[in-house]
Swiss-Prot record:
Di-iron-containing protein involved in the repair of iron-sulfur clusters damaged by oxidative and nitrosative stress conditions. One of its GO terms (cellular component) is cytoplasm. InterPro entries: Hemerythrin-like, RIC_family, ScdA, ScdA-like_N_sf. Transmembrane segments: none annotated. Belongs to the RIC family. ScdA subfamily. This is Iron-sulfur cluster repair protein ScdA. The lineage of its organism: Bacteria, Bacillati, Bacillota, Bacilli, Bacillales. It comes from Staphylococcus aureus (strain JH9). Homodimer. Keywords: Cytoplasm, Iron, Metal-binding, Stress response. It is found in: Cytoplasm. One of its GO terms (biological process) is response to oxidative stress.
Amino acid sequence: MINKNDIVADIVIDYPKAADIFRSVGIDFCCGGQVSIEAASLEKKNVDLNELLQRLNDVEQTNTPGSLNPKFLNVSSLIQYIQAAYHEPLREEFKNLTPYVTKLSKVHGPNHPYLVELKETYDTFKSGMLEHMQKEDDVDFPKLIKYEQGEVVNDINTVIDDLVSDHIATGQLLVKMSDLTSSYEPPIEACGTWRLVYQRLKALEVLTHEHVHLENHVLFKKVS
């Protein structure tokens, strides 16, 4: 049974669908997930701890036996899973979404300057993530696999620390984009492109939080 002293990130490791519940009440299970459920709920004004625990325990009871839980994968299989489930979809979404973000800034930015800042922040986020994922694929992940196979990797702790630092910077950019868009809530006068951009940026945030959580709290723990 899940209780108030359990760690947020650990709950999501054991029950991935719990991420949806934490997300719905604004609790960070990603870079800020190493806190108890009680401590996390106290930081949120409108979160009832008992109600939150009930929802989490409902997820625990309905957890489907035999469903894929990445925590049971070995390092090399987990890396393949991360690349297929997050790296490739993110690259594809960046390619498809960028023209809409650019259009939104160009058309509506003159009257809504925060949309220009949104594009600049998105561009920084995109370039950082693309560079980060490529480095993981080409350099860092092969080192983790070598470590799993028993080879000596002298800088393994530095590799992990650097990746976690990148993830923290990524999280800060996500927070900034959410703040600029009032948590991706479009204004009443928003056109179709405006609404599309907000909707897809919000989905991008969800995907990135899941991605970073899986690396920080599952993959890296297997090699540290």
